[in-house]
Structure formats: structure tokens, C-alpha cells
Amino acid sequence: MMDALRVLLETSTFNEVLRGLAISILLAKLTQSTTSSSKSQGSTFITASGFILIYFFARSWLALVNHYAPEPYLDEVFHIPQAQTYCEGRYHEWDNKITTPPGLYLLSVGWHKLVRLVECTPSSLRSNNLVATLLIALIALSCRRRIEAQTAVGIEKSAVSFYAYHTAINIALFPVIFFFSGLYYTDVASTLVMLVAYWNHLNRVASHSEKPGFLNGLWTVVLGVAALFMRQTNVFWVVVYMGGLEAAHVVKGLKPKPVSKNDTPDFVLENIRDSFGFWLRRYAVGDVHDPPVDMAWPDDWALCLLSIGIAALCNPLRVLRQVWPHITIMGLFAGFVAWNGGVVLGDKSNHIATIHLPQMLYIWPFFAFFSAPLLIPRVLSTLADLITHARTPTPSHTTTKDPGRSSWRFTKPSITSKKSSTTKPPQRSGPTPASSSSSSSSFSPDTNSSGRGFRFILDLVLSRKLYYPFYLLATILLSAAIIHYNTIIHPFTLADNRHYMFYIFRYTILRSSLVRLALVAAYTLSRWLIWKRLEGNNPPLRDLAGETGLKITKNKLGWRDEFSASPFVTQDFYGPKTIKTDEQKNIKDKQKEVEEEEEEEEKEDWLIGGAYTTLSLSSTQPSPATSSPPTSTVLLWLLTTTLSLVTAPLVEPRYFILPWVFYRLLVPAMPVSSSLVSSSSSSSFASSTTESGNGDGNDAATAARQQQNGNGKRGLLWNIIRRTDAALALETVWFLAINIGTMYMFLFKPFYWKTASGEMLDGGRLQRFMW
């Protein structure tokens, strides 16, 4: 260890420190919002601190690797000589053992010419990935900023939230990415190019009114081809994921004329054909069903895919005008496959495409392990909800049971949740609910309808989500069947004990078939936790709206009525209100008061520092960072992940990098009141709003205002600290700990391959542990 410290001190020259600081400050300046004020110098320094952490941590890792493993190691044995061949201008020479395209080597040649490096040495080639890691943080920040801008309003659209910044830093520190920042592998550069392509895609869908031009389409093709030059499997992310998102963007921007409730046929047995025909026509004109993922159940997933698919098929020219670059990329890739005789370059015998469905089971524990700090708030929130609902009796003033909310309402609300009879929901492009004075509870039996039994069953199955336990059981049985019939153990997994996956398989999957089946529980729980984390958590506002029928308009949460286009939601879902008028008015007054206070606070925050104080983490006014992604986006992510993984017989953590990166970019922020920091303010507000109308909640609002005013006087640093999600900070610490552990194993725990008789193998070279 003393030798390692000496190496770090020797490489940390004054010029090196200045270079690192200059690069970090430059990157921080590039992230600054155009709305930042003259006081943004402090925020620039704090922004730079994240890049400083990445630079010096990665620089130290690179220096140690160059010292302890100066010669090419493992796959570097193929990559470094090939890059050196390109550096010498011999572009027609190719090592047939290399299976990936030459994108990494071309980037290296360009980088060496840019910085005027004469020779392509192992250390100089490895340094390419250090630069790429810094750029990953920068581009990831831009991508997350664009994602948040999709639900932002006003000044927030041009802002950079602290959550976006912290997320970008953590993505760059992701252990499987960061480890290869010190080695010459394709993964870091491939991730960077994919993020650039994704950033371009987000710019293309930034507006429904402004269509991307032809030159931008050509640029999209160039970026897509560049991504394919890094890895062949990137075609799924460029074509399926980004192309699918752009197709969905087009059909959601059609904006059909709204229809009245009187023109909407009721979904009853004798009218089922007319109802289906009506909704097929509505989907055809773009009235699609795409709720936020935290409001969607499996039936919503099916309706989402169906409605968007119908809309795309019925509007082919509009869709083609948007997605032609992705179709072009797919055509070019198909031409390459035909010319090459397959997807893989070089050694095709050990990389044969095989249907390997267990990959979609292995990925969930992988995600859960690395996302453990982010899952803690969700677990605690679920446990708290379970305890609360178990202890809290039904309010005495509630005269009608809410049939629109499922029995699993503590998990998430349903889009079939009851609305108030006196508060009209905002009009959307689909049917609008009529006054509930003409209806009772959800799908209540109608004595004038012969289909009341059908509606009652529909109520049980869809409104109360009676099918959900059967859905869970089906996923468990399907997982068990996949394990039993499709488990594949690639020879490389068992032949190389230098990879961590060797030991994971050895002590779990290879133990016995019983252990394999027992792991279904881990796969199921991990999948549920990851999905719930994608949903985010905004319980105070949503529970408040669901219980009282408060009007939810186009707020920062993005929860609005306009996404609902389901034939199963009728006027009967909007039952009589179950709360006193005075009590509802009291809640509205308190909500309005807190919102006004938060607006004033946000104005002050903007003036303090544009890049850091844009994220409002209050319980009643969630910022765009807390908005859950649309269901279509998550389903496309899941589809693309499946396509990119199930064709690979070999299980490698590196294959999970892009699925994890895109998942992490979609994860919404957790309100501070829902994080590990404190939930006192949220609890006080939630409890005050559920009082029986006596106005006791005003004390909580006053206390919160006094606390906020006091905190605002402590300056930028305190503002950042109190707005920082502790789970996000814990994720940073978690990644640093994992990185230090894997660095230690690679550098200081080498071993030799020996036969049973003690004879050295592999020429007596040191072997090292790695991902």
C-alpha cells in the first residue's frame, strides 16, 4: 500500500493537478444554465467538485494500473496491438480474434492526433477512457436535463437540477463503467457514443410543434452508425429504443379533437362492439393511452402498446417523417450483416447468437445490488404504508367505499381512481367524465342494463385489479420455467476464474437445480423493487388527491387526466364525494398557501445558483425531476433490454451497462420528505390535510415556512445540503466503496494459474480479478 501511495504522489505533479482543475471547471461551466445569475460562481465551484472527484479518482486508478499492470491485460492483448496498427496507418490489417467493430481504435487515432501524441502506448491508449468517463458525466447530465424538461414549465425548462447533476456523477462512477476507465476496453467509449446519440434523440423530441430538419436526420444517422462502430448490439438501442420513442412522440403529438361523454358508448356487454370500435377510432387519430408508469398497471401496459401501435399504423407518413433516420440505420446494419455473413466480426465460433431468456432474470439482482441505496426509501415507504393502512380505521365520514382504487392502493394509485363530483377533471382529448350526480359507485349495477353482471366482473377484474395476484403468480411460474428449460452455462463462464461472474455462478446457479429455482424469489423481489423505483414516490399529493378529489391540473408532477384513453374508465368511476365540503375547502386553502410560499422560495433559489437550486423537493410541489417516466418509455426500455441480452449466451456485467445507464437516467428523484433525510415536514403536511376540517394543519404550514425562511439565510451550501437526497449521496458512497474494493482486488490480489502439480500456466503471467 505504501508503494501505491508513492506512485500516486509521483504522478500527482503540480501541472497534473492544474490540468485536472482546469478540465473540471471547464466541464462545470458547460453545465451552467443560461438563467444563472452573477452569483453562480459558487455553484460553478460546487459543480466542478463532482468532475474533480471523477478526474482525480480515475487518474489515480489509471496511474496504479499503469504501474502494476503496464503490459496489456486480458482483452487488451487484442485491442492495444490493433489500435497501434491503426495509429501506424495500416487500416487494412485486422486481428480475426476481435469480434467488435473498429470504432474504439478510430477514436483513439483521432484523440492522439488531436493532442499531438506521437506514439500509441498502452498508457496513452488507456487514458482515452479517462477522458471518456468525464464526458459520460457531462452528456449524462445533459440527457437527464432534457428528460426533466419534458415535464417542466417556464424557467425550469432551461435549468439544471441538482438531481440531474448528482445522477450524472453517479453514472460516471458506476463500478462496471469506472473500472474500465483504467483499461483499454470498448465499453466506456461505447457508452459515451450511445449517450451522445440519446442526447440528440432527446433534442429531436423536445417539441411537438418543431419537427427535426433533414440535416438533423443525417446527423442522427451519423451518430447511429458511430454507435454501431462501437458495438453491434447498440443497434437495438438506436433503432428500437430511440426509434420507438420518436414514433410514440409523433402519435402523442397528433392532438385529436376532444369528444364529449355523451358521444362515448358505455362499455357494457350488449354495446361492446360499438365501444371497441369507438376506441379503435380514437386510438387511430392519436388519442393514445400512455399514463406515467407510477399510475399504470399491467392492463394499462397492454392498452399503451395497443393504442400507440394503432396510432402509428394509421399515421404512417407522419411516423416515417420522424423515424426515417432510424430505419436508415437499420438498413445499413442489415447490409453489414449480409456482407459480413453474420453479426460478429472475427471469431464467430464462440459468439453464436442463442436465445438465452435467463438473462432477463439475472439483470434484476444486478440492478438491485448496485441500486441498493436508491431502493431503501422505497422499501421504507412501503413498510410505512403497510403499517399505516393496517392501523388506520376507515374514516367515519366516508359513506361510500372507493371502488375505483385497488386493494393495493398503498402501492400506487390507479388511473381509475375516483374523482370529485364537484370538481371537474381537466379536459383531455378523450372522453370527459360527466357529473357524477347521475351515477353512483364504480360500475354499480344498472337495473336498466342486462349487462350488469358483466360490468360487475369488469369492476372486480380491472377496477379492483383482481387479476394482479394471478399476474404475479404467472411471472413466478414463467421464471421457474425459463430457469428449468433455458439455463445456459457458456464455456467461457466456467473456464476463466478471473471474472467475478465465475464465482457468482459457482456458488449459486451451479450448486443445484433446487438452488436455481429458489433464486426465483430473489429475481421476483429485485424486479419489483426496480420497477417501483422507476415509479418514484410522491405520496402526499397523490394520496391527498385520491382521498379528497382535489383538482389536479398541469402541475410539475405531470399527473393529469390527458393520458387516460381507456374503454374501461366510464362515468361510473366518478362516484359521489366522500369528504365534507368545509374540509375540502380547508385542504385547498392550506395547499394554496404552501404553494405560494414555495413559489417565492423557488424564485430566491434561482437567484442563488442556477445549476443547483432548481429542484423543488417539497411534498406538495414536486419538481420535474420527480416526475415518473411515461409507460411507453419504460416498456420500450424493457423491450430493448430484452433484445440486447437474450441473444447473448455469455453472462457478463459489461452487457448490462447500457440497460443500467438508461434505467438510471429514467429514475425520478425522490422528494426529500420521502428520502432518508427526514419525513417530518411531509408527515406534518399529510396529517394536517387529512384532519376533519378544524384547521389544525395551519400550524404545520407556519412551522414549515419559518424553517424554510431560516434555511434560506444560510446560503448556497446549506441550500444544497437540505435539498440533497440522502439516498443519492449514499449511492455515491456505495459506488466509491465498490470501486475501491474492485481496484484493490485487481491491483493487490493477483494470482498465478498452476496445474495440480504446481507447474505454471500462461507463461507464468500474473492473473487479476475483474468484472
Curated annotation (Swiss-Prot):
Name the cystine pairs: none
Task: Identify a single GO molecular function assigned to this protein.
Answer: dolichyl pyrophosphate Glc2Man9GlcNAc2 alpha-1,2-glucosyltransferase activity
Catalysed conversion reaction: an alpha-D-Glc-(1->3)-alpha-D-Glc-(1->3)-alpha-D-Man-(1->2)-alpha-D-Man-(1->2)-alpha-D-Man-(1->3)-[alpha-D-Man-(1->2)-alpha-D-Man-(1->3)-[alpha-D-Man-(1->2)-alpha-D-Man-(1->6)]-alpha-D-Man-(1->6)]-beta-D-Man-(1->4)-beta-D-GlcNAc-(1->4)-alpha-D-GlcNAc-diphospho-di-trans,poly-cis-dolichol + a di-trans,poly-cis-dolichyl beta-D-glucosyl phosphate = a alpha-D-Glc-(1->2)-alpha-D-Glc-(1->3)-alpha-D-Glc-(1->3)-alpha-D-Man-(1->2)-alpha-D-Man-(1->2)-alpha-D-Man-(1->3)-[alpha-D-Man-(1->2)-alpha-D-Man-(1->3)-[alpha-D-Man-(1->2)-alpha-D-Man-(1->6)]-alpha-D-Man-(1->6)]-beta-D-Man-(1->4)-beta-D-GlcNAc-(1->4)-alpha-D-GlcNAc-diphospho-di-trans,poly-cis-dolichol + a di-trans,poly-cis-dolichyl phosphate + H(+)
Q: Which domain of life is it from?
A: Eukaryota
Listed A to Z, the keywords are: Endoplasmic reticulum, Glycoprotein, Glycosyltransferase, Membrane, Transferase, Transmembrane, Transmembrane helix
Q: Where is the composition biased (Acidic residues)?
A: 594-604
Bias kind Low complexity: ranges: 411-426, 435-449
UniProt EC number? 2.4.1.256
- Protein function: Dol-P-Glc:Glc(2)Man(9)GlcNAc(2)-PP-Dol alpha-1,2-glucosyltransferase that operates in the biosynthetic pathway of dolichol-linked oligosaccharides, the glycan precursors employed in protein asparagine (N)-glycosylation. The assembly of dolichol-linked oligosaccharides begins on the cytosolic side of the endoplasmic reticulum membrane and finishes in its lumen. The sequential addition of sugars to dolichol pyrophosphate produces dolichol-linked oligosaccharides containing fourteen sugars, including two GlcNAcs, nine mannoses and three glucoses.
* Entry's family note: Belongs to the ALG10 glucosyltransferase family.
Q: Which protein are we looking at?
A: Dol-P-Glc:Glc(2)Man(9)GlcNAc(2)-PP-Dol alpha-1,2-glucosyltransferase
